[in-house]
Amino acid sequence: MYYLCIFLWVTSVACQTSKEIYQLLSKSHTNQNLVVSPVSIETILSMVFMGAEGSTAKELQSALGLPSEDKEAVAARYGALLNDLQGQEEGPILKLANRIYVNDQYSLNQNYNLAVREPFKSEAESISLTNGPVAAERINQWVLDQTSGKIKGMIDPGSMTSDVKALLVNAIYFKGQWESKFDPAKTRASTFQVTANKSVPVQMMAQMGTFRANYFRDLDAQVIELPYLNSNLSMTIFLPREVEGLSALEEKIVGFARPLVAKEVYLKLPKFKIEFRDELKETLEKLGIRELFTDKSDLSGLFADKSGGKVSQVSHKAFLEVNEEGAEAAGATSVAVTNRAGFSTFLMADHPFAFVIRDANTIYFQGRVVSP
């Protein structure tokens, strides 16, 4: 449940978890477009950790790679991350919005919201599930508001039944402009080779400029970094040489931290839009988070009833749109494009590729484009 809601590398708050989440989702959704926000998933699960006790807390700590059982330390760590995001007055808009909804048949532990409200900029909220469609509409409207209208239908009304105890909702909104924009006048109709035997029509953007890029022989792939305006965020694109080389490449670039070199590049990149939805329970169970979803779950820091409760649902929905301006941008500003002659590198993303949106420390989005 994330907006723009994406690859991986260096360290997010819990880098190893980010890698594993993406790998699991990638393998369970083969041959399709994918976009995920690992940091969003980590944040909402760390919120749950704040209300967990006993073996449930230890399970979350282990799966998330949290360095300490000290909840104040965990809160401080995520508080610093979210404060940094809120402090960005220029450049891309990047907003994380998390909420835990609890069936109002179960009383909330009021100390829980006191513990998470400031560091996580969020809280748990009671909700009536006597009317599932009404409850779903309320949650969906909140997600819609948090994502500037991009994430619609987050919760299936049919899933909101009275036996649901708690569900986790997370949205992340991103809007950024390229530091070097594509000129819309240079965008042309073209084709994208999905497989060796299948192609689809696309609108192919083009520009020439200086970018950090490189070709890695052992990866058999080109890598290019596209920075965002007034920001330390960038999108890195991983383009395999072979049309059907993405699967092998995704295995190799886990933990990618290779040097890129500033060079003149003639770049062609398709406009694309990705929407991805998944229920994360099965994925999280594979990460080792199992007790949370059973009657043995100890969430006595979240529920007033010491018998606690379990999490019934972890929904994830992501949306990403890339065009001439950047990510989820509106309007158009023309940029001069000179002749291609003399440029040392040609990168044409006309077949499946992987991407990441990140800064030096945190993975915000990761995904792949199989068919724009």
From Swiss-Prot:
Disruption phenotype: RNAi-mediated knockdown results in the constitutive expression of Drs. Expressed in the ovary. Keywords: Glycoprotein, Immunity, Protease inhibitor, Secreted, Serine protease inhibitor, Signal. InterPro entries: Serpin_dom, Serpin_fam, Serpin_sf, Serpin_sf_1, Serpin_sf_2. SMART domains: SERPIN (SM00093). Pfam families: Serpin. Glycans are attached at residues 197, 232. GO terms for cellular component: extracellular space. Residues 1-15 form the signal peptide. Induction: Up-regulated by the Gram-positive bacterium M.luteus, the fungus B.bassiana and the yeast C.albicans. One of its GO terms (biological process) is immune system process. CDD domains: serpin42Dd-like_insects. It is found in: Secreted. One of its GO terms (molecular function) is serine-type endopeptidase inhibitor activity. Belongs to the serpin family. Serine protease inhibitor with activity toward trypsin. Involved in innate immunity to fungal infection by negatively regulating the Toll signaling pathway and suppressing the expression of the antifungal peptide drosomycin. Acts upstream of SPE and grass, and downstream of the fungal cell wall pattern recognition receptor GNBP3. May function specifically in the GNBP3-dependent beta-1,3-glucan branch of the Toll pathway. This is Serine protease inhibitor 42Dd. It comes from Drosophila melanogaster.
